Amino acid sequence: LALPAVSQVIQDGLAFDAVVALNDRAAIGALAAIKENQLAMPISIYGIDGSPDMKVLLSTTDDIEGTVAQSPLKMGRQVMQVIECMRTGKSYKEQYKIPVEMIDKDNVDRYDVNGWQ
């Protein structure tokens, strides 16, 4: 979805110097649109997911600035704890904060490029 949307923005002549995408796939689509339309870099591109593809791009090119890694495992564990509280009638909080991590060129080597964070 990002490739045609970003292509349209470029063709409409709207100037931009950054893309913050909904997820890593969209960030990669935005990058493809920028390259396909031969827009001059640098344009800062960020994604969300900590996907293997984004980590490879981070470690091998200057095209991507970063990705925010969420932890589906931590989220799932928290959800299961809340479900258990609901099931047993125990109290639980309305909101939970689950930390995320910014992965960029300075720290991508600390993450496995073959897996999700």
Q: Which ranges hold each PLM region?
A:
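Short glycine-centered helix-capping/turn motifs at secondary-structure transition points
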Residues: 37-38, 62, 115
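Short, well-ordered alpha-helices that flank and scaffold nucleotide-derived cofactor binding pockets
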Residues: 32-36, 60, 81, 85
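Extracellular/periplasmic bilobal clamshell ligand-binding domains
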Residues: 54-57, 87
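Structural detector of well-ordered beta-strand residues that form the stable sheet scaffold
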Residues: 44-46, 65-68, 103
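Hinge/cleft segment of the Venus flytrap/periplasmic-binding protein
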Residues: 50, 71-117
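Generic structural signal for alpha-helix termini and adjacent loop/cap motifs
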Residues: 12, 61, 86-90
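Hydrophobic alpha-helical
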Residues: 1-55
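Short beta-strand elements at the ligand-binding edges of bilobed clamshell
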Residues: 60-73
